[in-house]
Amino acid sequence: MYSSSVVSNPNERLVNNRVENDLESSDDTLSTQAKPVSRLLTRKLLLGVVVLFFLAGVSVVSYFLFSKYKMLNKFKRELDDHLTKDFPNLERSKRDTCFDELTRLFGDGFLSDDPKLEYEVYREFEEFNSKYNRRHATQQERLNRLVTFRSNYLEVKEQKGDEPYVKGINRFSDLTEREFYKLFPVMKPPKATYSNGYYLLSHMANKTYLKNLKKALNTDEDVDLAKLTGENLDWRRSSSVTSVKDQSNCGGCWAFSTVGSVEGYYMSHFDKSYELSVQELLDCDSFSNGCQGGLLESAYEYVRKYGLVSAKDLPFVDKARRCSVPKAKKVSVPSYHVFKGKEVMTRSLTSSPCSVYLSVSPELAKYKSGVFTGECGKSLNHAVVLVGEGYDEVTKKRYWVVQNSWGTDWGENGYMRLERTNMGTDKCGVLDTSMSAFEL
């Protein structure tokens, strides 16, 4: 017996099946129609989001451009007022050039919104160009130099006095770090040469040397050469150091250091004052490369073998030329030695002003006065003359006295006091290698 809910009539079953099929077909149709609608809504939503982001971006850019426009106009107005009020006699052409260059750099984002400060930097830059005879090939090069100079000038201006040395503006102030190191390629120092203590003591035992040594040590007492260390010795006290020289744009520090040391040797040992020709070394030392760099060892060997004429007979011309030496009196050295480490102080410096290598850096190049404790270069790349050692009462630091060849407007009238660290080859590698002239 079947349930009453079961349809037994075939016709009725057929009708029911058709109804069910129609309902399923209707559902499929609705589903098919809903999909395009859903896609359309999704696309409209995405388009709306894109439009909103675009409008937001346009608004931000517009706001930025408008703000930049307002700031530029404000800078122009304040700069114009500053020039008109505080510099009424400024030539019109110079005023226009200054105004155009500063507003251009401000618009490019290189300057602050303080026109008084920026014009101060600008005036210092103009004085710098005049002092060091700078010429710029294009306006873009000039503006690039101004931006670099500005960075160095503000670093000097904003010193807080926390360091025991003072920075200053000098010939390197418009150079980038990369350009600076290009001027000072790595130098390879020679190996030490053997010399026993008795040999060194015997050559120093002459009256002229002992007289000058006592002056250099600032003492009237007799000096025990066997215990001589080099501390508190300054060859400038005995007038055993010749004048500061200027290598200008020539990378000939190796020649200047050699000549300065040889001149110091004759002053300290024989009271003979010479101004020898750096140019002869630049022109004629075939193992070096003139103003592109050279070797101290090669320079000393040239002086030993051939000697040097005076600077008056063959003056420095800021470039290397074909070797042509006039017939004139020559000064040579009988011998020379290379020292390393502590012997740079105890044997080389105690004998006379000596040539040493340094690892110089852009920070060191900014030095103006005080005891330099700043960052050195990573490799030996410069040669100078070591003339003494001392102690600074203010900073409570010991230091080395170095004569540079960057002119008297650099450092302390051409000299530098370099912190003595007593670590390794000491500050900036000053104790790495030295060379000194000696008697046979």
Swiss-Prot record:
UniProt-listed GO biological process terms: proteolysis
Taxonomic superkingdom: Eukaryota
Keywords: Disulfide bond, Glycoprotein, Hydrolase, Protease, Signal, Thiol protease, Zymogen
Top-tier EC class: hydrolase
Positions of the UniProt region annotated as Involved in processing to yield active enzymes: 166-182
EC number: 3.4.22.-
Claim: Disulfide bond is one of the keywords in the record: yes
Keyword flag rRNA-binding: no
Propeptide, residue positions: 61-229
InterPro entries found in the cross-reference section: Papain-like_cys_pep_sf, Pept_asp_AS, Pept_cys_AS, Pept_his_AS, Peptidase_C1A, Peptidase_C1A_C, Peptidase_C1A_papain-like, Prot_inhib_I29
Organism: Theileria parva
Name of the molecule in the record: Cysteine proteinase
Family listed: Belongs to the peptidase C1 family.
Pfam families in the cross-refs: Inhibitor_I29 (PF08246), Peptidase_C1 (PF00112)
GO molecular function, one term: cysteine-type peptidase activity
Residues modified by glycosylation: 206
Disulfide bonds: 250-291
Signal peptide boundaries: 1-60
Catalytic site positions: 253, 382, 404
